[in-house]
Amino acid sequence: MKNIIVIKLGGIAIENLNDAFIQQINAWHLENKKIIIVHGGGQVISNLLTKNNHSTIKIDGMRVTAKNDLPIIYDALINIVGHQLLERLKESNLEFFQFKEKIKELVSAEFLNKNIYGYVGKVKEINTMLLEKMLSRDIIPIITSLGVNEQGEYLNVNADHLATAIAKKLKVEKLVYMTDVPGVIEKDKTLATLTINEAKTKIENKIITGGMIPKIESAIQTLESGVESILIANNLQKGTIIRGD
């Protein structure tokens, strides 16, 4: 379905959603674009864990998750971040569906490495039929970064990886990573475009560093699966567009 746009929102991006974001969502809707929104929890999860006297440990950027952390993480993702996002998006007058318990029907996951990360999952399967049914009715799904394993247990899933998995599975037109930076930065300037080979070279030459590396690597894999373009930005219009060579 080439008219689908997947938008991944980080915690800071959700806090800073502005009228321009709502206007762009409405504009895409008028162009008959189908939209899917994926979000994580970030600092909200950390704050709620701390409030409940649970520690936050990260290994390789992944939040180590104990089984008794999951009710708190669920609460942060669904009842705080997801609810806040839904209330903001309602200003567009479009129809949205927030995945809560129904996430069990959408995202199948398995342990990433239980011995190291605990109840952290990697995406195993996406129920694309469920998404396509919603999109055909002009409903915009709001999907949080959780998955469910074969035992029916919730697993904490990386939101970037979940958005990538959905984009690859549906072979969407565009994937947007909304972050707290305007795009890929080189010499204090935002790069307008990047090809796959240029991106790989900039990683090798340490021009692209830190938290941007996994985003770029995910972008490359997504493009190679058939997605047309990826936008990394702090808005929906202008940032760094990555395309195939």
UniProtKB/Swiss-Prot annotation:
Subcellular compartments: Cytoplasm
GO cellular component, one term: cytoplasm
E.C. number(s) listed in UniProt: 2.7.2.8
Keywords linked to the UniProt accession: Amino-acid biosynthesis, Arginine biosynthesis, ATP-binding, Cytoplasm, Kinase, Nucleotide-binding, Transferase
Pfam family, any one: AA_kinase
CDD domains recorded: AAK_NAGK-like
Pathways per UniProt: Amino-acid biosynthesis; L-arginine biosynthesis; N(2)-acetyl-L-ornithine from L-glutamate: step 2/4
Enzyme class, spelled out: transferase
Key word Plastid present: no
Gene3D superfamilies documented for this protein: Acetylglutamate kinase-like
Known catalytic reactions: N-acetyl-L-glutamate + ATP = N-acetyl-L-glutamyl 5-phosphate + ADP
InterPro entries, per database record: AceGlu_kinase-like_sf, AcgluKinase_fam, ArgB, Asp/Glu/Uridylate_kinase
Principal location: cytoplasm
Function: Catalyzes the ATP-dependent phosphorylation of N-acetyl-L-glutamate.
Protein name (record): Acetylglutamate kinase
Annotated source species: Staphylococcus epidermidis (strain ATCC 35984 / DSM 28319 / BCRC 17069 / CCUG 31568 / BM 3577 / RP62A)
